[in-house]
Swiss-Prot record:
Predominant location category: cytoplasm
Source species: Staphylococcus xylosus
Alphabetical UniProt keywords: Chaperone, Cytoplasm, Nickel insertion
Function of the molecule: Required for maturation of urease via the functional incorporation of the urease nickel metallocenter.
This protein's name: Urease accessory protein UreF
HAMAP family registered for this protein in UniProt: UreF
Subcellular location: Cytoplasm
Domain of life: Bacteria
Subunit architecture: UreD, UreF and UreG form a complex that acts as a GTP-hydrolysis-dependent molecular chaperone, activating the urease apoprotein by helping to assemble the nickel containing metallocenter of UreC. The UreE protein probably delivers the nickel.
GO cellular component: cytoplasm
Pfam annotation, one family: UreF
GO function terms (MF aspect): nickel cation binding
UniProt record similarity statement: Belongs to the UreF family.
Length: 189
């Protein structure tokens, strides 16, 4: 039987979903310009490092903490995590990219779903108390859809791997087959 809640969350992983992920490289562009990333192998090495050093321990860990805060109705913990995620991204481009993606994601999610937490998070941004990080938005949406946290994190990481790979396919350039090979190899056995 198909789990429709999972499909609804997975919709936000689609590279055609208009969050702006396709236009943010999160540092990849710099590595390409410096010829550190220039082919399939060097991109995959960069992607593994980004996934293991940045996404897993910053976004992934925060997602688990946000999920727990949602379960405990701890709004202050969510605001604290929002600020931490924003300031730990040192490059201005990365901070702005995350902010734009989070803003777009929460607006789209709020249009599609009636979630008190997403509405609250958006209101906090309007009151200048929150930035709207995509990892937090995605977690709130998954929580609203009653998807377990492990799946929420897996989908979020997949979405990032897929988007960054599509960016690399265009920027390096890599072929579409090479891009799909990389995405396939990034999925744990």
């Amino acid at each position: 039987m198909i789990d429709h809640a999972h499909l609804r969350l997975f919709q936000f992983c689609d590279s055609q979903f208009p969050t702006g992920a396709f236009s943010h490289s999160f540092g990849l562009e710099t590595y390409i310009q410096r010829d550190i990333v220039h082919d399939e192998q060097s991109f995959q090495q960069w992607l593994i490092l980004f996934l293991n050093e940045q996404l897993t321990y910053a976004d992934g860990l925060t997602m688990r903490l946000v999920y727990n805060a949602l379960e405990q109705d701890d709004a202050q913990a969510i605001l604290r995590l929002d600020r931490i995620l924003f300031v730990q991204n040192l490059p201005k481009e990365t901070r702005q990219g995350s902010k734009q993606m989070g803003n777009r994601m929460v607006k789209l999610a709020s249009e599609l779903y009636d979630s008190d937490w997403l509405d609250w998070y958006h209101a906090q941004m309007l009151d200048k108390k929150a930035i709207l990080h995509p990892a937090i938005c995605f977690t709130m949406l998954g929580h609203h859809l009653e998807v377990d946290i492990e799946t929420i994190i897996d989908y979020y990481l997949y979405q990032n791997v897929s988007s960054l790979t599509q960016n690399a396919v265009r920027a390096i350039p890599l072929g579409q087959t090479a891009g799909q090979r990389i995405v396939h190899q990034m999925i744990p056995s």
